[in-house]
Amino acid sequence: MTTRGFRLDQDNRLNNFAIEPEVYVDSSVQAGWTKYAEKMNGRFAMIGFASLLIMEVVTGHGVIGWLNSL
């Protein structure tokens, strides 16, 4: 039973702790080509491409030329 944000147990004792959400088990397999993995891969690729462009603008050399100068 719930009354005004407080929960009473079966013996009508007050439980003034926070009401916890229902617990569930996600039994689906989360390996391989998931949507989350694809989003993260795309985001890291965009960050890498943008950093290469910034490096080329700052140094004045392309990536291959910069690697040859090392």
UniProtKB/Swiss-Prot annotation:
One of its GO terms (cellular component) is photosystem II. This is High light-inducible protein HliA. The keyword Transmembrane helix applies. Signal peptide: none annotated. Disruption phenotype: Single deletion mutant and double hliA-hliB deletions are out-competed by wild-type in high light (500 umol photons/m(2)/s). Quadruple hliA-hliB-hliC-hliD deletions die rapidly in high light but grow normally in normal light (40 umol photons/m(2)/s). Quadruple mutants are sensitive to norflurazon. In a quintuple hliA-hliB-hliC-hliD-hemH deletion chlorophyll half-life decreases 2-fold while the half-life of PSII proteins does not change; photosystem II assembly intermediate RC47(1) is missing (RC47(1) is PSII monomer without CP43). De novo chlorophyll synthesis is very slow. Changing residue 35 to A: Increased accumulation in the absence of HliC, mutation mimics HliB. Pfam families: Chloroa_b-bind. InterPro entries: Chloroa_b-bind.
